[in-house]
Amino acid sequence: MNIGSTIVMGACAGLATLAAACGSSTPVSEREPVSRTDLQRHDLSIPGREALQTRVDFQPGATAARHKHPGEEIIYVLKGTLVYDIDGQGSQSVTAGDVLFVPAETFHSVRNVGDDEGSELATYVVDKDKPLLVLAK
């Protein structure tokens, strides 16, 4: 692992800790089944590319429909038990502290199989000026 990778991983871990510490006072029954909170967005030194970080919260039983992104997605699970169905990789169950990589333009879905809220920190390295999420038809 090079120094750049180490810095990025350290930054991701720090942001994950910060995101996990942020609670919500809204009762669970009033929350959206899947909600996204954009944390940061930055241009990269690679022309036409940008990085985004988003916290995604899943209520018990909630599913994010099959979709893809115009770049890579790196997932850090903050809490709960989530099952990802990724084209070409099958189903993968992950829990708090686990990481997962979704290749660019790969359709996937995720569902919260736990009895409590599940949350992830999603880091995207994507093509700029393209929709972040494209639903499967």
Task: Give residue ranges: language-model regions.
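Short histidine-centered beta-strand/loop micro-motifs
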Residues: 64-69, 86, 111-113
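Glycine- and acidic-residue-biased ligand/ion/polar-headgroup-sensing regions
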Residues: 70-88, 98
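Short acidic-glycine-tyrosine-enriched beta hairpin
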Residues: 58, 88-105
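A short, N-terminal "cap"/entry segment at the start of jelly-roll beta-barrel domains
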Residues: 2-55, 101, 133-137
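Extracytoplasmic
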Residues: 51-53, 69-72, 105, 118
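A short beta-loop-beta micro-motif enriched in histidine and acidic residues
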Residues: 45, 49, 61-74
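Ligand-binding loop in jelly-roll beta-barrel domains
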Residues: 91, 105-130
